[in-house]
């Protein structure tokens, strides 16, 4: 999901250079919120249903052909997008695909991020795909903070977002530390909002809501567009390398980002976010994974425990200007 959010930066730069260019984004309907105001078209993709199989990708390609697409930019580079672009290429449509820099990232990990330059940012890699198709434009400038509606009503005081979750254990803040971080933030700020998915994440958020009167669990209360609107009204967001960090980058909200097994130098740091918000442990064993999806070699995820709740609270204070 964070990959989709990052695409909005690249498309903003492309549309600023080519305002009359017709761009159609093939993605899940829920992600349309990331592209508000960019004058784009959409093709809804149902990867759990009609577009799940090879046949489904060919059907999606046929739909794209009927739309009259002149070129395909594959910024995802996974099996389904390869099938999609190949189907159109076989019908004579020019295609370009992302170069993910796998060797560059492996070298960064092998050297522990020491003495090696950071990998190219994913947003720039997205821009490069469009450049392969002949479009000439600059890398996007960071997003600007703009007024957006507040789904939580009138704001008074300082509001903080907290999102300790990720799809990977190596990028998820430990639960016990998360509870302590919420306590410190709730004691210090007027309102704290817990961003989460469902299941155990939602239960953690509801637990924190029950424990502190100024904490609000967001799951089930707002959709993706409402959550993005809320983030735009927050003073700071605490997030892992996750969707919420990238959503904050879209609306220029300050972020304190916590990094475990992976590293901001691998190209996935929130585009345009202030690097002063980065929290990570200097350990010989990290980074050890590009995506944070490999098990910890020690079994204890010590890199995450090294970033304490007190460190998070103090960094938030710095980011909000206390």
Regions found by a protein language model. Name each.
Residues 1-322:
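Catalytic machinery of carbohydrate-active enzymes
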């Amino acid at each position: 999901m964070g990959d989709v959010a990052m695409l909005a930066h690249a498309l903003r730069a492309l549309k600023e250079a080519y305002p009359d260019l017709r761009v159609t984004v093939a993605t899940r309907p829920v992600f349309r919120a990331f592209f508000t105001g960019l004058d784009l078209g959409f093709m809804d993709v149902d990867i759990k249903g009609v577009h799940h199989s090879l046949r489904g990708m060919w059907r999606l390609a046929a739909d794209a052909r009927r739309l009259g697409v002149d070129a395909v930019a594959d910024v995802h580079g996974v099996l389904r997008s390869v099938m999609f672009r190949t189907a159109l290429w076989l019908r004579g449509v020019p295609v370009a695909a992302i170069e993910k820099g796998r060797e560059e990232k492996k070298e960064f990990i092998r050297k522990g991020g020491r003495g090696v330059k950071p990998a190219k940012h994913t947003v720039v890699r997205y821009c490069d795909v469009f450049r392969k198709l002949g479009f000439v434009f600059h890398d996007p400038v960071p997003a600007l903070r703009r007024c957006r509606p507040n789904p939580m009503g009138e704001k008074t005081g300082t509001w903080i977002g907290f999102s300790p979750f990720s799809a990977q254990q190596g990028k998820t803040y430990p639960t016990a530390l998360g509870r302590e971080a919420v306590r410190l933030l709730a004691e210090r700020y007027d309102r704290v909002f817990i961003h989460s998915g469902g299941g155990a994440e939602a239960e953690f958020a509801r637990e924190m809501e029950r424990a502190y009167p100024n904490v609000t669990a967001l799951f089930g209360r707002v959709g993706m567009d409402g959550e993005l609107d809320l983030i735009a009204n927050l003073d700071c967001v605490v997030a892992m390398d996750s969707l919420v960090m990238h959503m904050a980058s879209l609306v220029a909200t300050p972020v304190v980002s916590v990094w475990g097994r992976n590293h901001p130098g691998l190209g996935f740091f929130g585009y345009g976010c202030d690097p002063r918000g980065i929290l990570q442990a200097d350990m010989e064993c990290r980074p050890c994974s590009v995506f944070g999806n490999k098990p910890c070699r020690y079994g204890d995820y010590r890199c995450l425990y090294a970033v304490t709740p007190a460190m998070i609270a103090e960094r938030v204070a710095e980011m909000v200007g206390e």
